[in-house]
Structure formats: C-alpha cells, structure tokens
C-alpha cells in the first residue's frame, strides 16, 4: 500500500533528492563537462537525464559507466530494481552554459594558466557563442598573501527584476591551488530566442520590436472611383439659338 504524504513534504523530498543527485553527479562527472540534471517521473519509472559536454565519457565503454552510475543511484536513493533509468544528453550550446564554462575555467587554472588570460579566453568564447553579456569573477589569493577579486565583464547584464530568473545563468565553483582556494563565479545573460532553444521565449519587458512598413504599390494608370448611387448619364448638348 502506497504511503500518503502531504504536498508540502513531497516538494521538500523532491528538492532534497534533486540536490543530492546533483551534488553526486557534480563530484563524479566534473571532468566530463557535467552541466546539470533533469528528473522526469513517469508512472512506470523515473528518468534521469544527465546534461554534459562529453557524453561519450559519461556513457563509458559499451555503456559500462552509465550502468555503474544507475546502480549507485538505485542503491543510494532506494529505487526498486529496474525503476530508474539514466540517459546522457549533449549540451546544445556549451558557450551558453554557465556550469560548463565555470568548470572549463577551473581546469584552466589548475593547468597553471594565468588568471587574466584564462578569464579573457572564457569571456571571448561565451560572447562568440551568442550570449548577450557575461561576467566572470575570480576571488582569492591571486597575487601575494592579500586576497582580492578580479571581475571581467562584457556585453549587457541585468541584475534585478523577474527576468533575472530566466535570462541569467549562474554557476559557482572552487579550485584548490598551491596558494589557497580560489572562488569562480560565472554569469551568462542568454539571448532572446522565440523558438526557446538557446534562450528564453519571453522577451525582456523593455524590448522594442520595429515592424518594417510594407512597400506601397503605386498605380501606373489613373483610376477614377464613382462613389454614391448610380452614375448619371452625360448631359445632352443644348441647341445654339440663331438670331
């Protein structure tokens, strides 16, 4: 018999499940360009879609790695046998995914690349991918013992109002270097896309669309229009009186 739980408890349980799942996959698939997870619950099973830039690494040789992840998720969250399925989906535009770019910057810094050069490289790649604007902040012991932060901005970025919720993609990551821990924050402002593939369908409130006027077709020959009732017959010529 199914246990009845209140809607409030169900929402909390779903939120905790997704947060724990996201944390686990972030730890396991950090090197494979992990960019997020979607959970779809159907009457028969639960489908978990893993978004990543390198899906082949997530799947593994002959699907071995995805089967291992499925077994771990099934055991950890107490799913019945065969009721959970994991899929790997490639991120459509890597340059518009804040998580993917934060991870990319993290590995650049771990590889010993200078902070300024690494940040400008990420900034350029994001803008070339079609973003409306972006902001990269790196904070920590960048030079010397005193901690400071460096901010790199390009394009347009909104900071307040409801459009921030669906126009700005944000990601925070931490990287442990020899001098200490650096914090990485990446914010990407997505472009307006009526199809909803690379950005939100809803335009910004201050967006103005200018409609091009239609070309007016000028008449080549003069046309007279008769308005009102029936046309009157032409007047008969009057005889000229003779003296």
From Swiss-Prot:
One Pfam family for this entry, by name? KH_2
Annotated region Disordered: where?
200-243
Stored InterPro entries: KH_dom-like_a/b (IPR015946), KH_dom_type_2 (IPR004044), KH_sf_prok-type (IPR009019), Ribosomal_S3_C_sf (IPR036419), Ribosomal_uS3_C (IPR001351), Ribosomal_uS3_CS (IPR018280), Ribosomal_uS3_euk/arc (IPR005703)
| GO CC annotations on file | cytoplasm; cytoplasmic side of rough endoplasmic reticulum membrane; cytosol; cytosolic ribosome; cytosolic small ribosomal subunit; dendrite; mitochondrial inner membrane; mitochondrial matrix
For the cross-link Glycyl lysine isopeptide (Lys-Gly) (interchain with G-Cter in SUMO2), the position is: 214, 230
Mark the residues carrying the PTM N-acetylalanine. Answer: 2
Q: What is this protein called?
A: Small ribosomal subunit protein uS3
Q: Which organism is it from?
A: Rattus norvegicus (Rat)
């Amino acid at each position: 018999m199914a246990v009845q739980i209140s809607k409030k408890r169900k929402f909390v349980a779903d939120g905790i499940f997704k947060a724990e799942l996201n944390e686990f996959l972030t730890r396991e698939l950090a090197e494979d360009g992990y960019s997020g997870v979607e959970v779809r619950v159907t009457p028969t099973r639960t489908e978990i879609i893993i978004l990543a830039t390198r899906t082949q690494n997530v799947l593994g040789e002959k699907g071995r790695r995805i089967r291992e992840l499925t077994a771990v998720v099934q055991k950890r969250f107490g799913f019945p046998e065969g009721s959970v399925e994991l899929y790997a989906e490639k991120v459509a535009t890597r340059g518009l995914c804040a998580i993917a770019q934060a991870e990319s910057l993290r590995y650049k810094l771990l590889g010993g690349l200078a902070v300024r050069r690494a940040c400008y490289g990420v900034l350029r790649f994001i803008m070339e991918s079609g973003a409306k604007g972006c902001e990269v902040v790196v904070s920590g012991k960048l030079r010397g013992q005193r901690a400071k932060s460096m901010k790199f901005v390009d394009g347009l970025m909104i900071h307040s109002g409801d459009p921030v919720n669906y126009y700005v993609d944000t990601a925070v990551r931490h990287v442990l270097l020899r001098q200490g821990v650096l914090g990485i924050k990446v914010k990407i402002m997505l472009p307006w896309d009526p199809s909803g593939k690379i950005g939100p369908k809803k335009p910004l409130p201050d967006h103005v669309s200018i409609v091009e006027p239609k070309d007016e077709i000028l008449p080549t020959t003069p046309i007279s229009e008769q308005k009102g009732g029936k046309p009157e017959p032409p007047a008969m010529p009057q005889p000229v009186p003779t003296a």
